[in-house]
Design a protein with these regions (language model features):
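Short, solvent-exposed coil/turn segments
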Residues: 27-30, 71-73
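Short helix-capping/hinge SLiMs at alpha-helix to coil transitions
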Residues: 18-29
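A short, conserved structural fragment
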Residues: 56-67
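Short alpha-helical segments that sit at the start of domains
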Residues: 1-19
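Short amphipathic alpha-helical interaction segments
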Residues: 42-57
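Amphipathic alpha-helical dimerization/coiled-coil segments
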Residues: 1-4, 86-94
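Short, cationic-aromatic polyanion-contact patches
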Residues: 66-90
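A short alpha-helical element within helix-turn-helix/winged-helix DNA-binding domains
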Residues: 29-40
Length: 94
C-alpha cells in the first residue's frame, strides 16, 4: 500500500510539534516564524498565513509576536495548543 504525503496543514502541525516547549518563552527559534515554517514544509512564505488560518480558527494553533533568534525585530510565531498537539500526535502515529 502506497503512503500519501501529508497535506500542508498536516506538515505544519508535525513541524510545530517539535517546538511545543517554546510556547511560554520570550525568545523563540526561527523555525516557528512564518519563514521558518515555510522552509520546513516547502511552501512560499506568503502562503503560510493562508495555510494556518483554518488551524487558528479550529483552535489547534495560536499566533503571537515574539523575539525570534537571529532577527532584530519581533515576528509572528506560531504554537500548537493542547488540541493541536493531540492532532499532531495522531497524524504522527499514522
Amino acid at each position: 500500500m502506497a503512503s500519501t504525503r501529508p497535506g500542508v496543514q498536516e506538515r505544519i502541525l508535525l513541524h510545530l510539534r517539535d517546538y511545543v516547549d517554546y510556547a511560554e518563552k520570550v525568545e523563540v527559534p526561527f523555525a516557528i516564524s512564518q519563514m521558518g515554517i515555510a522552509n520546513a514544509v516547502s511552501i512560499a512564505r506568503s502562503n503560510v498565513p493562508r495555510a494556518i488560518s483554518g488551524m487558528k480558527e479550529s483552535g489547534h494553533l495560536i499566533e503571537r509576536q515574539a523575539h525570534v533568534t537571529g532577527v532584530s525585530r519581533k515576528r509572528k510565531a506560531y504554537f500548537l495548543t493542547t488540541e493541536g498537539v493531540s492532532l499532531a500526535d495522531s497524524i504522527w502515529d499514522k
